[in-house]
Amino acid sequence: MLDPNKRITGKQVYLRPITDSEEDTNNIIRWRNSETVRPYFIYQKPFTVEGHKQWLEKEIFAGKGFQFIVCRVEDDKPIGCTYLRDYDAHSRKAEYGMFIGEQIEKGKGIGTEILGLTMEFAFKELKLHKVFSRIFADNPASIHSVSNNGFEQEAYLKDEEFVNGVYRDMVLLAKINPDEVKTEEQK
């Protein structure tokens, strides 16, 4: 488990480890249940306090993933969440995801900063070799965001997830740790 006082700081936002506090729980529930966030997740059922706390215990606090609350630098206001899930220490990889829960914060370049800070943690602190992301094909903004930050498309997954009675396509993108990218001579 991460030190609860840890901060990964950028220009506009910083990341701090999620806690099981009432504030973090209420924010996650509100954000994940909002119509601007929920449609972009595979798990579409309403989030509950009990379900969220179980997730924290079984996944985050058990070391199977890392989840951060994203806060504004200027006033410490929580505005979203970022995470690395399905952490595989042997293969040194994890799945990346994030969301900005506060609508007013969208369109300010914060998503790009969150991605950069999360990759800094993944590659420099966890020493991951690879980070991947599965994104619904009908979410071009997220695909564009990760692609602009060094993620490359590895697969287009047709009818990958059955969500709300409809099969949806997904795009699998990944980024190799820049410190480990092989040159042509090394291949």
Regions found by a protein language model. Name each.
Residues 36-37, 64-65, 127:
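Generic structural signal for secondary-structure transition and capping sites
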